Design a protein with these regions (language model features):
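Short acidic, glycine/serine/threonine-rich loops at helix termini
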Residues: 14-17, 89-90, 119
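Conserved P-loop NTPase nucleotide-binding/switch module
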Residues: 20, 47-48, 52-105, 110
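Conserved P-loop NTPase
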Residues: 103-158
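P-loop NTPase switch/communication element
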Residues: 1-42
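Glycine-rich, charged/polar anion/phosphate-binding loops
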Residues: 36, 91-92, 115
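A broadly conserved detector of short glycine/acidic/proline-rich loop/turn motifs that flank catalytic sites
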Residues: 8-9, 33, 57, 111-112, ...
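Flexible, glycine-rich phosphate/dinucleotide-binding loops
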Residues: 11, 84, 114
Length: 158
């Protein structure tokens, strides 16, 4: 059971109430919901095992993610930044990572190969990185290994 909180209708591409992107039979899409309230609505009414959302960063969103995790719901979310240094300066992202909310960070490239997995690191490793000219457009936060998928490898090369 998966719930997608799709504030800007980018993930599910819902048209007339039907997701146009294939997200799976056991997936509920909350299209057009603000992420903070959408995450809480999903937890309370849809009983998801996993919630997906994109472009997190606001305090209300982080509060809702922490509430979902406290209820036993796993969360996969993205945050956009040009560099790890930039991401590290965002207080709400720091708060999430320091809370232990996420175990893994998946760094996705930008530029000519958007979405390409550049690196997978433990969330704890993040605080030792970010001083160089890293050029990552998105970070995908994954809080746990998922049954049937197995563990994420510690590093993926170019």
């Amino acid at each position: 059971r998966v719930a997608v909180v799709d504030e800007r209708c980018e993930i599910g591409a819902v048209y007339e109430g039907i997701p146009q992107n294939r997200l799976g039979a056991a997936c509920d899409v909350l299209s057009g919901y603000p992420k903070g309230p959408g995450i809480l609505t999903a937890v309370r009414t849809l009983s998801p095992q996993v919630i997906l959302c994109d472009e997190i960063g606001a305090r209300e969103e982080v509060d809702s993610i922490l509430d979902a995790l406290n209820c036993g719901v796993r969360v996969i979310a993205t945050a956009h930044a040009a560099t790890l240094s930039e991401l590290g300066r965002r207080g709400q992202i720091q708060r999430l990572l320091q809370s232990g909310a996420f175990e893994k960070l998946v760094l996705l490239g930008g530029g000519e190969e958007p979405g390409r997995v550049e690196q997978i690191m433990g969330a704890g490793e993040f605080f030792g990185k970010g001083s160089g000219n890293d050029d990552y457009r998105s970070l995908l936060f994954d809080d746990r290994d998922f049954p049937g998928i197995g563990p994420v490898p510690p590093s993926v090369g170019p």
